[in-house]
């Protein structure tokens, strides 16, 4: 409570000063000294000093500042306090317009005479300050309201009650101050509305009378203040003192203008003031309790947040604002000027001065704090600065004086400066306070000098660079700021960067360099690992291939041994024909045979069949060697092929389920029915071990070699008597020995033998047909149609190539359509448009058919006579093949033609005109003699020429490539190099080394064999070696590519002999059919329409037959040549295939030749360059040897020499 009481008592003089208009200390000391009242004054001083120190203990440094100001002012001059009061009241008026209106009721009881005494002072001080010290006057701040509302309101309601309740801590003046703060805003508005004109009328006379005395002593007082303050705070202290003067001078006129009270109240208020002797703080600190920096907050304290703005932040911390509003006594002064007051007597004025001596001394302590707060207000509110600069210019408007005040002022001016006041406080403590205050003044001086030194800054432009933390360091003991957060710490850190731009760039470059090196290291490690992995993979692949080859060799050896054993033991027996018969029957069975019968049925069948045990392997192998390609022979090539043929074709579509439970033995199964082999009698049952080794292989797939060997051993076991032969076969014929003649005739082939041929022929083209809207020029390419089920070792381009859609077909048709040289004729459809107005169009065709024919008519820009002429004369210059095909396909069918002809016969001429255009077109087309037969012959003529040309080209490419591989010596040289290099690389390996040859499937893989440094591969080395050691013409124009062209191999790889055979057969059938049609036309046509059709067609068919026979023989030769090539190079079929196709062989060569040719071109160029370089060097050597040095004789010099010689000769003569 001590801090709170001190705060209340401290605020009271600040409010009481303006309200009571107490005289300055100079006058008070003079009067008291004159009257001998100094002892009374000194007796009161120790208490107020103790109150000052106790009140400002939490503020740490504020008490030093205010106490030091108080003592310095007491030492220097007493008039300074009144000047400071004047300045404070004026500045507070402009700084915070929130106070004034509510302060008026409490300021009324104060004696008006005391307020009027200082009016002359105010005018002089305001005039001087407005001219020279605008910066000091305008130092103001925005005050944070911390005073509780209940306390202020209670104090403002009843001034009389306040007088009785504040005898100890000066609550009277505190309430006065709090209410004044609340009413500041209203007083600001009222003062604006009332204006200053009213004040001018009442005060103008007194200003002129009282101003000269004040102007004489006021400069002296200011000079004494400036001389005493040696730490650079003279401007700040002057600001504080002027604020006090303004506050004292303006409060009285304002109160007088707002509210009027009777003189009795003034007297009572005056008496209450006389009884007070305790120290009272101004109301400015009434609601504020502050804590020292670093201490904990007490329960009743209120921490005020101070917003730091500019250089005077330390001053801001010295004052704690009130919650309600700031002190604006300038507005209250204006209103007080209009209030009529009773002029007190001279004795009352003197007694009042004696009674308020304690309060006046305390107010000196507060002058510094108030001045500091107002300095901050100047920074917080720019508007306040403007008002502060204009308000002091009119002191006469705000001041009203009376004769008593003027007399007292003249009387007060006569006294000299009072003696220095002696205090009962501890001198050492006061000296310590003064030293601290000097240190603080030095720091604050540096702050303000820094802000003043900035160019272009006005009085209101304070530097905002200082942070709260910086102020705390320079002014220790100031209040700690709570808001805003100390972001200035971050700014202070940024005063100097931790690194420069050059260091930053160097760090970035270093990081980039490290990043690049790390990436290069990772790449090298990755490549090394990949190289090792590839090597390991190649080694493992080679080992696996070696293992596979070894296993294959062992398997072949075992099979050969078993076959020999079977041949030695199983010589011809009496039952040889029956096993073959049984075998053939098994081949002919379908899938149902193996699905329907149960295990008992199978057992019954096996018991009745002795055939599998009597199968002679030697006879079968002999038949393989003698028959060759005859697949329909009686002896199938081997047991493996016999057992694997049927299941591959028949069983995979639906594998048989597990056999059901065995029922009773049924009759023999379907394989032995009369439909398959009539007259077959079931044989007696064989040994029990025989069936188990054969039947499962028929049911579930091709047998494995070990199982076959067991079956062969079973066949060699002795068997019971064989059944009789078939009725139509006669006695059984013994099988021939391995070296004997031809085998017996083969049985009828089973259905499985024809499966492949029917399957491939039934498949059509993969892509739909395209029908352009106009006839296009033919593109004579070799069409390759891939079958959907065809499987090749290496996928071709045509299997994966997707045909894009043509976006703009009209442009393409316009550019590449056939060019007709004849004049443009009207479309055929226009010939039917010249009709009379038809009442109804007659349609005989259905809607879709009529629409199709109508579209055809619209697309044909031809007349019917042109079509007829082209067909009769076999002329394709006018009507091309595509148009003729369209006419042939859309011709009238038999039923349609009957309807149309009947309509023409039964209708009149006018009705015929009503017939629709499609019907008329079809009828006229049918009137061409033998249109169908003639069109078919003409179309076949074109189709045959294209088909036979395609077959010829394919056959020719196969023949040419095969002969090139057989006859070119360079091919043998290259393969010899590869064999030599391969044997050298496989040296020391028992399975791969010392090879006499190699499979050609390795040729495309040679490019994958890299050198140790990965610079070249084996193909590169072979090419380089061949060009430098084998080809004598390497690098010259005579050098020829040593292999067939890769494009020839590619075209040959697309050829299938089966397709060529089918194409020739189809051409043969179509040729025969067309020839019959031609003969029919010749029989039915009249003489006028017979020629030139007959002549041209007969000639065509004769040539077509010859070409077909020629291509058939060429195809046979090509097949033989290809087979010879396959045998020449020792090529074996691809795993899983029986035959060797051109696709497999020529694809291998195509890949190898493509790589070889690319490298060959590159190396040939390099060798050519080397040869040119060598030739140039040799030429240069020859020219250097034969070079004759010749001296160039200057013709001019030689002539002069001759002339000299002549002159010499003449002189000599």
From Swiss-Prot:
Residues 766-1182 form the FH2 domain. The keyword Amino-acid biosynthesis does not apply. Its main location: nucleus. Keywords: Coiled coil, Developmental protein, Nucleus. Residues 428-450, 503-572, 1050-1125 form a coiled coil. InterPro entries: FH2_Formin, FH2_Formin_sf, Formin_Cappuccino_subfam. Present in the adult brain, kidney, brain, heart and intestine and throughout the embryo. Residues 636-647, 755-764 have a biased composition (Polar residues). Residues 652-751 form the FH1 domain. Residues 187-210, 431-464 have a biased composition (Basic and acidic residues). GO terms for biological process: actin cytoskeleton organization; actin nucleation. Residues 650-672, 680-689, 718-751 have a biased composition (Pro residues). Signal peptide: none annotated. It holds the Pfam family FH2. PROSITE patterns: FH2. One of its GO terms (molecular function) is microtubule binding. It is found in: Nucleus. SMART domains: FH2. Residues 1-24, 66-111, 144-169, 183-216, 357-489, 624-774, 1193-1213 are annotated as: Disordered. Is important for morphogenesis of limb and kidney and may be involved in determining dorsoventral neural tube polarity and motor neuron induction. It may also have a function in differentiated cells or be involved in maintaining specific differentiated states. Belongs to the formin homology family. Cappuccino subfamily. This is Formin. The gene is LD.
């Amino acid at each position: 409570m001590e801090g709170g009481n001190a705060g209340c008592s401290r605020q009271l003089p600040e409010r009481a000063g303006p309200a009571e208009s107490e005289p300055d200390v100079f006058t008070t000391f003079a009067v008291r000294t004159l009257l001998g009242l100094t002892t009374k004054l000194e007796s009161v001083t120790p208490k107020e000093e103790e109150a000052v120190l106790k009140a400002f203990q939490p503020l740490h440094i504020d008490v030093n500042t205010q106490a030091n100001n108080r003592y310095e002012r007491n030492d220097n001059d007493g008039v300074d306090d009144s000047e400071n009061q004047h300045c404070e009241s004026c500045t507070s008026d402009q700084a915070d317009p929130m106070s004034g209106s509510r302060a008026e009721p409490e300021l009324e009881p104060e004696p008006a005479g005391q307020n009027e005494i200082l009016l002359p002072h105010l005018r002089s001080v305001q005039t001087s300050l407005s001219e020279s010290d605008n910066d000091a006057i305008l130092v103001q701040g925005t005050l944070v309201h911390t005073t509780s509302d209940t306390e202020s309101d209670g104090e403002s309601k009843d001034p009389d009650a306040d007088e009785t309740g504040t005898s100890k801590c000066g609550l009277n003046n505190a309430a006065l101050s709090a209410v004044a703060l609340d009413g500041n805003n209203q007083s600001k508005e009222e003062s604006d509305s009332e204006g200053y004109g009213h004040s001018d009328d009442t005060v103008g006379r007194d200003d002129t009378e009282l101003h000269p005395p004040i102007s004489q002593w006021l400069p002296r007082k200011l000079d004494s203040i400036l001389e005493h303050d040696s730490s650079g705070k003279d401007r700040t202290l002057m600001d504080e003192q002027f604020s006090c003067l303004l506050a004292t001078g303006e409060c009285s006129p304002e109160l007088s203008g707002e509210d009027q009270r009777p003189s009795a109240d003034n007297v009572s208020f005056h008496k209450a003031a006389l009884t007070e002797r305790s120290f009272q703080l101004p109301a400015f600190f009434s609601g504020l309790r502050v804590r020292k920096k670093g201490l904990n907050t007490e329960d009743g304290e209120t921490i005020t947040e101070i917003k730091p703005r500019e250089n005077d932040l330390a001053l801001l911390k010295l004052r704690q604002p009130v919650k309600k509003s700031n002190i604006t006594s300038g507005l209250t002064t204006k209103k007080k000027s209009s209030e009529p007051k009773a002029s007190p007597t001279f004795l009352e004025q003197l007694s009042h001065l004696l009674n308020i001596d304690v309060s006046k001394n305390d107010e000196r302590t507060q002058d510094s704090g108030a001045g500091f707060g107002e300095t901050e207000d100047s920074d917080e509110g720019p508007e306040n600065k403007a008002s502060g600069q204009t308000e002091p210019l009119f002191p006469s408007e705000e001041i009203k004086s009376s004769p008593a005040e003027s007399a007292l002022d003249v009387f007060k001016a006569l006294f000299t400066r009072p003696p220095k006041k002696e205090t009962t406080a501890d001198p050492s403590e006061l000296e310590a306070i003064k030293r601290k205050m000097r240190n603080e003044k030095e720091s604050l001086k540096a702050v303000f000098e820094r802000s003043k030194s900035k160019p272009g800054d006005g009085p209101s432009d304070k530097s905002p660079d200082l942070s709260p933390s910086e102020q705390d360091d320079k002014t220790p003991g100031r209040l700690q700021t709570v808001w805003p957060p100390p972001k200035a710490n971050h700014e202070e850190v940024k005063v100097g960067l931790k690194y420069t731009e050059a260091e930053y760039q160097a760090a970035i470059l270093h990081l980039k360099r490290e990043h690049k090196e790390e990436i290069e290291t990772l790449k090298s490690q990755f490549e090394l690992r990949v190289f090792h992995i590839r090597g390991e993979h190649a080694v493992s692949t080679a080992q696996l291939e070696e293992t596979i080859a070894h296993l294959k060799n062992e398997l072949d050896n075992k099979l050969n041994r078993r076959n020999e054993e079977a041949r030695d033991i199983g010589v011809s027996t009496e039952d040889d024909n029956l096993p073959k018969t049984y075998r053939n029957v098994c081949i002919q069975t379908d899938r149902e045979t193996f699905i329907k019968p149960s295990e008992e049925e199978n057992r019954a069948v096996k018991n009745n069949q002795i055939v599998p045990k009597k199968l002679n392997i030697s006879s079968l192998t002999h038949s393989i060697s003698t028959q060759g390609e005859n697949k329909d022979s009686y002896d199938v090539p081997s047991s493996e092929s016999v057992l694997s043929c049927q299941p591959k074709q028949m069983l995979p579509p639906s594998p048989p389920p597990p056999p059901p439970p065995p029922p009773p033995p049924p009759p023999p199964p379907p394989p032995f029915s009369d439909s398959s082999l009539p007259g077959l009698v079931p044989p007696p049952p064989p040994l029990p071990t025989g069936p188990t080794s054969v039947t499962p292989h028929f049911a579930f797939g091709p047998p494995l070699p070990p199982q076959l060997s067991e079956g062969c051993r079973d066949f060699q076991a002795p068997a019971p008597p064989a059944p009789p032969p078939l009725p139509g076969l006669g006695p059984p014929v013994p099988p021939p020995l391995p070296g004997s003649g031809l085998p017996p005739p083969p049985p009828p082939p089973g259905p499985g033998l024809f499966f492949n041929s029917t399957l491939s022929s039934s498949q059509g083209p993969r892509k739909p047909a395209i029908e352009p809207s106009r006839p296009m020029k033919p593109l004579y390419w070799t069409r390759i149609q891939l079958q959907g089920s065809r499987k090749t070792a290496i996928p071709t381009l045509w299997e994966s190539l997707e045909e894009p859609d043509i976006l703009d077909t009209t442009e393409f048709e316009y550019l590449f359509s056939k060019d007709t040289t004849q004049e443009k004729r009207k479309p055929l459809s226009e010939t039917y448009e010249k009709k009379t107005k038809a009442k109804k169009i007659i349609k005989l065709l259905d809607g879709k058919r009529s629409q199709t024919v109508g579209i055809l008519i619209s697309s044909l820009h031809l007349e019917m006579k042109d079509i007829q002429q082209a067909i009769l004369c076999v002329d394709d210059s006018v009507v091309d093949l595509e148009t003729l095909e369209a006419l042939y396909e859309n011709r009238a069918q038999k039923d349609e033609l009957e309807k149309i002809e009947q309509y023409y016969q039964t209708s009149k001429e006018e009705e015929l005109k009503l017939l629709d255009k499609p019907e008329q077109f079809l009828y006229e087309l049918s009137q061409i003699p033998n249109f169908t037969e003639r069109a078919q012959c003409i179309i076949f003529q074109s189709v045959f020429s294209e088909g036979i040309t395609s077959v010829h080209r394919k056959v020719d490419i196969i023949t040419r490539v095969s002969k090139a591989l057989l006859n070119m010596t360079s091919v043998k040289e290259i393969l010899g190099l590869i064999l030599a290099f391969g044997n050298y690389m496989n040296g020391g390996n028992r399975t791969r080394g010392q090879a006499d040859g190699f499979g050609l499937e390795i040729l495309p893989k040679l490019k994958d064999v890299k050198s140790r440094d990965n610079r070249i591969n084996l193909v590169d080395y072979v090419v380089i070696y061949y060009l430098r050691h084998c080809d004598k013409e390497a690098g010259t124009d005579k050098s020829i590519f040593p292999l067939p062209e890769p494009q020839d191999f590619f075209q040959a790889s697309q050829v299938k002999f089966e397709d060529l055979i089918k194409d020739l057969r189809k051409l043969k059938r179509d040729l025969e059919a067309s020839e019959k049609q031609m003969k029919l036309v010749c029989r039915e046509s009249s003489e006028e329409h017979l020629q030139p059709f007959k002549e041209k067609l007969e000639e065509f068919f004769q040539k077509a037959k010859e070409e077909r026979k020629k291509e058939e023989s060429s195809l046979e030769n090509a097949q033989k040549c290809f087979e010879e090539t396959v045998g020449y190079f020792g090529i074996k079929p691809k795993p899983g295939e029986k035959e060797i196709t051109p696709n497999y062989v020529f694809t291998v060569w195509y890949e190898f030749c493509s790589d070889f040719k690319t490298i060959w071109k590159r190396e040939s160029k390099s060798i050519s360059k080397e040869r040119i370089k060598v030739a140039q060097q040799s030429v240069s050597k020859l020219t250097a040897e034969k070079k004759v040095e010749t001296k160039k004789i200057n013709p001019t010099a030689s002539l002069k020499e001759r002339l000299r010689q002549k002159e010499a000769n003449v002189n000599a003569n």
